Amino acid sequence: VENLLGGDGEGWKIAMATAGFERGLMLRSPARFQQTAAKLLQLYLDNESDCSPAMQASIVEAWAQSESYALSIYHTASKMLAGGSIGSESSLGKIFWSELDHMMHQTALKILGASAELSLDSKHDAAKWIKGFMFSYAGPIYAGTNEIQKNIIAERLLGLPK
């Protein structure tokens, strides 16, 4: 056989290593979430008088989670540079970013209110927030559904039975 990756019969092992790398470092850049959090903060500041105090907590949570995600990716990258590998913990990151993406876009739509659905006001880039919100539903599905990731976490990280 030509162009064989790994040994004979190791295809699943190679596929899982590739998927772990994809989930752990490649699929979603931390900068993407940091930029979205910054835009969300600006959206909040532009509409602060229309927002409830609870909305401020959502903005702080989005910012803190985007920074947490960046730190976890930096940790994973430094682990790899030191000769380590991406393990099953990449499943934690995949669930984290997919839920963070949805939460940030959902928060933006709450700030914009019903008018976001009725007009494409360029001042607030409502159309971009709506598009991002709709796309955020794909995150928990692609790169292995979040349900599958939870099973991986339970079995491989927590040692729970299948």
Region annotations inferred by a language model:
Residues V1-Y69, G139, E155:
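Glycine-rich beta->alpha junctions and the first turn(s) of the following alpha-helix
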Residues G7, C51, E61, Q65, ...:
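Secondary-structure capping and boundary motifs in well-ordered enzyme cores
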Residues G9-P30, L112-K162:
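Glycine-rich phosphate/cofactor-binding loops in nucleotide/flavin-utilizing enzymes
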Residues K13-F21, A37, L71-H75, K79-I86, ...:
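Short acidic (Asp/Glu) and glycine-rich catalytic loops that position anionic groups and cofactors
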Residues L41, Q106, N151-I152:
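Short glycine-/small-residue-rich flexible loop motifs, especially phosphate/cofactor-binding loops
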Residues L45, S49-Q56, E67-K123:
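C-terminal helix-coil-helix/basic helical segment that borders enzyme active sites and/or dimer interfaces
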